[in-house]
A protein has these predicted regions:
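Generic secondary-structure signature for well-ordered alpha-helical cores
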Residues: 50-57, 126, 155-164, 175, ...
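A C-terminal functional module that forms or caps the active site or interfaces directly
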Residues: 194-225
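A residue-level signal for conserved active-site and pocket-lining positions in enzyme catalytic cores
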Residues: 41, 170, 217
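Metabolite-binding pocket within alpha/beta catalytic cores that recognizes anionic/polar moieties
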Residues: 9-153
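Glycine-rich beta-alpha junction loops
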Residues: 110, 171-177, 212, 220
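Active-site rim beta-loop-alpha module in soluble metabolic enzymes
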Residues: 145-200
Length: 225
């Protein structure tokens, strides 16, 4: 006998396949623009979409919310990723399958370098791979690097808008409290030593998605920054 839950899952998968929908983000080819903004928090999608012309809610499934509209006549979308590398990499892989090819990660981070003040913009050029998702794609020797075209565009925009900004390396982690309360962790010595090393190396900020997004972008040959 097959459990009822298995039958239900199979029926959902078949329905998505028949409609051409991606399994997690629930969008299909034509639903999204080539350019996608990727916040972590689903609630931020509606706020971002308010800047679009003719914005429409396309999908709302799990942590993945997608709106599509237009900016200066160009079709663009916003899709949330949830927290961390696993869910972010799923969103990116499925958005690429749906036809998108240029992505901007937007969200909050924790400042590390003393020059990074609250409210400053941090443009990540690359990420320290302290998370586990990218290890499923390639050995640790391969770097997680943002696309240069996207980085340059973000820096140019920050300059034009007069924002205080910093461009450089960020730390990407899996455990929020492992970094913010390291002394409570069984491996506190390792976490603290690495944190101090990153500071000495000029790491700008700490967050939880960039490494996975940069890495999957490199693998899929799309632009991510």
């Amino acid at each position: 006998d097959v459990p009822n839950g298995v039958h239900k899952k199979r029926s959902v998968i078949m329905k998505y396949a028949e409609e051409g929908l991606q399994y997690h983000i629930a969008v299909k080819n034509g639903d999204v623009g080539k350019y996608v903004i990727m916040p972590g928090d689903p609630k931020r999608c509606k706020k971002i979409a308010a800047y679009f012309d003719d914005a429409k809610l396309i999908a709302d499934n799990r942590e993945y919310v997608t709106y599509t509209g237009y900016l200066d006549g160009v079709k663009v979308s916003v899709t949330s990723t949830g927290i961390g590398g696993p869910s972010a990499s799923i969103a990116l892989e499925e958005l690429v399958k749906a036809g998108a090819n240029t992505f901007i990660r937007i969200g909050t981070c924790g400042g590390m370098d003393i020059d990074v003040k609250g409210g400053d913009v941090v443009v990540a050029t690359s990420a320290i791979r302290m998370e586990g998702t990218t290890k499923e794609y390639a050995p640790i020797e391969f770097p997680a690097v943002a696309n240069l075209d996207v980085v340059n565009a973000l820096v140019d925009s920050a300059k034009k808008l007069g924002f205080e900004y910093h461009a450089g390396v960020v730390e990407c982690k899996d455990s929020f409290y492992g970094q913010h309360e390291p002394e409570k962790m069984p491996v506190n010595y390792e976490l603290i030593n690495k944190w101090n090393a990153w500071l000495k190396l000029g790491c700008l900020a700490s967050e939880m998605e960039s490494a996975a997004l940069f890495f999957v972008g490199s693998y899929l040959r799309v632009k991510v920054g």
